[in-house]
């Protein structure tokens, strides 16, 4: 998943994540997080934006302006939900599920609250309405 915020909020989002005591991954250069029994690999450099299609990047830019992105990889949906519940409250940005949806963070959190077992890899948010 990818968390996107306006570029001017980069330090705020990074601060929320760095408080969890990340450690460098000597192999990938990314950062690792071990929290609540889960393991995460994070790319805080924002390079994931280079992988966006032009229309996707336009959608993000039209919504939040120039974006900053954090890529988060983890082992399970439970891990993903836990991370997002820890990080997203109060974030004014977007969540890219990496499964064809980019949703406002507040809406994403609301959907997770109403549908605690939601697996966005298999079920689009429009099926939850």
List the model feature ranges, each with a label.
Residues 1-129:
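Acidic (Asp/Glu-rich) sequence patches and key acidic residues
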């Amino acid at each position: 998943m990818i968390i996107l915020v306006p570029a001017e909020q980069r330090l705020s989002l990074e601060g929320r994540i760095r408080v969890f005591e990340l450690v460098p991954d000597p192999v990938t250069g990314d950062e690792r997080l071990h929290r609540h029994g889960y393991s995460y690999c994070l790319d805080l450099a924002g390079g994931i934006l280079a992988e966006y299609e032009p229309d996707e990047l336009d959608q993000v830019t039209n919504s939040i302006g120039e974006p900053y992105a954090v890529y988060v990889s983890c082992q399970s949906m439970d891990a993903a939900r836990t991370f997002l519940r820890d990080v997203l409250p109060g974030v004014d940005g977007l969540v890219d599920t990496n499964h064809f949806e980019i949703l406002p963070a507040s809406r994403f959190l609301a959907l997770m609250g109403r549908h605690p077992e939601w697996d966005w890899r298999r079920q689009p948010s429009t099926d939850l309405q």
